[in-house]
A protein has these predicted regions:
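The short alpha-helix immediately C-terminal to the Walker A/P-loop
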Residues: 42-43, 202
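ABC ATPase nucleotide-binding domains
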Residues: 77, 92-228
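C-terminal boundary and immediately downstream tail of ABC-type ATPase nucleotide-binding domains
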Residues: 221-244, 272
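Non-catalytic connector elements of ABC transporters
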Residues: 5-32, 38-39, 46-49, 60-61, ...
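Conserved ABC transporter NBD signature motif
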Residues: 53-65
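A position-specific signal in ABC ATPase nucleotide-binding domains
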Residues: 48-49, 56, 86, 102
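ABC ATPase nucleotide-binding domain helices that frame the ATP-binding cleft
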Residues: 38-41, 141
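Catalytic "switch" loops of ABC-type ATPases
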Residues: 47, 78, 82-88, 192
Length: 345
């Protein structure tokens, strides 16, 4: 599977400008609410028309503004799974799935329906209506309806957002198994970084309508390239920074100079440090702090610290470790050079 997306769309004051490619993988579009994730999916599916650009799937042009190509949704071979699954409430499980098989030759449809009923563990539920299914069964039915039509690409738009925490975990595990067993590519839209880490191979971060370069999920969490990517991946500590001649980074908000073991781009403007990267013993990158506030979580402690600059730091650590330091007002934190992340705009 090869997907090429290079489009722009303006809606009021919002301007979408995304450019990425995807192979046969589970790729996330990760970003905050309102950043353009769902609009991007709509453009790929043919529900939203871009103002200009090009969309191509497996060598077939789905949209090209210059060539005036704009295939209707039913001809794009793209399947969409939305937040509420959009099952037909008056139809049974089998009827819902059969509705997705209309693009296949008539002599293949019955066999295809039987195969996906088995593959999605829906046998015995064929005559049930959606209201009689659990959340996980509804999702399996919706995915079966999509995949019985043999799409070349599946779009998942926040598929867990309407579920409570316990059901969400169960449904996520089921979806993970399903995605491993089907060979079409998948675009997964979410604002939840944990879902991305568990389910996806690669990720493209969207920030205020603009896409960052695609990267592996592991690299996003280990060394995000931009401030937007760092924040959406959960980095709690970001300071404006200046690159010094010796390659160190002066962190303006924290009033400290830090060494980094990572590559420092010329246009580095910020430094990020994850909340769990700090220690109280080390040889490099000392940061003098004053304890300002302590917040107890069920299984960890969050310590808010004032630096010698105008900015604060957030440190998250094991409760037992904090108990050995409790009552301390002045602390010097240390961070390894490999944990200091240079960030561009």
């Amino acid at each position: 599977m090869a997907l090429i997306v290079n489009i722009e769309k303006t809606l009021g004051d919002f301007h979408l400008k995304v450019n990425f490619t995807a192979e046969r993988e589970v790729m996330a579009l990760l970003g905050a609410s309102g950043c353009g994730k769902s609009m991007t999916l709509g453009c790929i599916a043919g529900i939203v028309r871009p103002d200009k650009g090009h969309i191509e799937l497996n060598g077939r042009v789905l949209f090209d503004s210059e060539k005036k190509i704009d295939l209707p949704p039913q001809k794009r071979k793209v399947g969409c799974l939305f937040q509420q699954y959009a099952l037909f409430p008056h139809m049974t499980v089998e009827q819902n799935i059969r509705a997705g098989a209309h693009a296949r030759p008539k002599n293949e449809r019955e066999q295809a329906v039987r195969e996906v009923l088995h593959a999605f563990r829906l046998e015995g539920l064929e005559n049930n209506r959606p209201s009689q299914l659990s959340g996980g069964q509804q999702q399996r039915c919706a995915l079966a309806r999509i995949l019985v039509g043999q799409p070349e690409l599946v779009l998942l738009d926040e598929p867990f957002s309407a579920l409570d925490a316990y059901l969400k975990w169960q449904v996520e595990l089921e979806l993970s198994d399903i995605l491993k067993n089907f060979s079409c590519g998948t675009l997964f839209v979410t604002h939840n970084r944990d879902e991305v880490y568990r389910l996806c191979d690669t990720v493209c971060v969207l920030n205020k309508g603009k896409s960052d370069p695609k990267e592996t999920v592991k690299n996003l969490f280990r060394a995000p390239a931009t401030m937007g990517a760092a924040l959406i991946s959960g980095c709690k500590n970001v300071s404006a920074a200046e690159v010094k001649q010796d390659g160190t980074l002066f962190c303006k908000d924290w009033n400290v100079t830090l060494k980094t073991a990572l590559n420092v781009p010329e246009n580095t403007a910020y430094v990020g440090i994850r909340a769990h990267y700090f220690t109280t013993d080390g040889a490099e990158n000392a940061i003098p702090c004053t304890v300002e506030r302590v917040v107890e979580n069920p299984f960890s402690t969050v310590v808010m610290l004032q630096t010698t600059g105008a900015g604060r730091l957030r440190w998250e650590l094991d409760k037992a470790v904090w108990e050995t330091l409790s009552g301390t007002e002045k602390l010097t934190l240390y961070v390894r050079p490999e944990d200091v992340m240079p960030l561009t705009e």
